[in-house]
């Protein structure tokens, strides 16, 4: 056990990099998990996205189903969609419930659709009183939102996450864990925490006789080997789950104009039968 032994830890860090790989794998899974909660209001673990436990059914984060919104028109229809109006409508609806939206989080490719919309270009051009060709950027749109009565203080935040996940067949793929068509409305960017507890092996004397162990953040790492024939294993595990601290203050909009599916019950959490 190298807990509290800086010299032993340094030796392990120098000799082996396996612990970095397994640690990053756990952190990557939690990034995937958090992005799913923020963009879908829940998650599903199945054989196509997880090599361990499966839920098969959607597990919500507790966000009220009333907070699930749908754009009036698919944002990809640049001549008829009005993303700025969709954003304003959601901010106003949240305000009526006592929620002050400050951030609208979306993927970069979704913002690319927003800035090409005819209605958006005309609104921004009229606001700055510019007749010639206008270059729409995140900075310009954020300045526009800040100047409007209903969206004062609202800022668009762009994300482009990328993580590697493993399925039940142990095939690894790189994915963007943020649901492509969805955007998230938040009061605070720090909208959740990772709740975690101890792992039984952490305090097992017998376990530590057979393995070198290290606790990094909430991730428990262990390394052990056999001599004949020589084999070595490194494992990282966490007894943890990400949670949205105030799901009532989070809103998610589908910008493809499609209704939420019946199975996406964001209000139903793992405490209700999963």
Please tell me what each predicted stretch does.
Residues 1-62, 86, 92-110, 230-238:
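Long, contiguous amphipathic alpha-helices that act as assembly "spine/axial" helices in icosahedral shell
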Residues 121-274:
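Sequence/fold signature of self-assembling virion shell proteins
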Residues 4, 28, 41-42, 52, ...:
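Residue-identity detector for glycine
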Residues 46, 56, 64-66, 196, ...:
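Intrinsically disordered, low-complexity, compositionally biased regions/tails
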Residues 1-6, 47, 67, 143, ...:
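Proteins with a high burden of low-complexity, intrinsically disordered sequence enriched in S/T/G/P/A and R
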Residues 52-136, 140, 144, 148:
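Extended, solvent-exposed, turn-rich assembly/linker loops in the middle of proteins
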């Amino acid at each position: 056990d190298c807990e509290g032994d800086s010299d032993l830890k340094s030796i392990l860090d120098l000799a082996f990099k396996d612990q970095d790989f397994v640690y990053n794998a756990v952190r990557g899974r939690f990034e995937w998990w958090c992005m799913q909660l923020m963009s879908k209001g829940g998650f599903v673990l199945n054989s196509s996205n997880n090599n361990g436990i499966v839920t098969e059914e959607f597990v919500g984060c507790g966000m009220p189903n009333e907070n699930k919104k749908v754009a009036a028109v698919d944002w990809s229809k640049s001549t008829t969609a009005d993303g700025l109006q969709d954003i304003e409508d959601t901010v106003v609806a949240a305000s009526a419930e006592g929620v002050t939206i400050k951030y609208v989080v979306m993927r970069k490719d979704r913002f690319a659709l927003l800035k090409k919309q005819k209605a958006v270009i005309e609104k921004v051009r009229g606001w700055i009183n510019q007749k010639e060709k206008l270059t729409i950027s995140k900075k310009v749109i954020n300045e526009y939102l800040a100047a409007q009565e209903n969206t004062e203080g609202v800022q668009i935040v762009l994300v482009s996450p990328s993580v590697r996940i493993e399925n039940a067949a142990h095939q690894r793929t790189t994915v963007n864990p943020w649901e492509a068509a969805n955007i998230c409305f938040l009061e605070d960017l720090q909208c959740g925490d990772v709740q975690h507890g101890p792992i039984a092996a952490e305090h097992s004397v017998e376990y530590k006789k057979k393995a070198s162990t290290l606790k990094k953040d909430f991730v428990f790492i262990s390394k052990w080997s056999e001599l004949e024939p020589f084999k070595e294993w490194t494992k990282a595990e966490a007894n943890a789950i990400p949670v949205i601290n105030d799901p009532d203050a989070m809103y998610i909009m589908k910008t493809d104009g499609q209704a939420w599916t019946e199975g996406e019950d964001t209000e139903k959490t793992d405490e209700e039968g999963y």
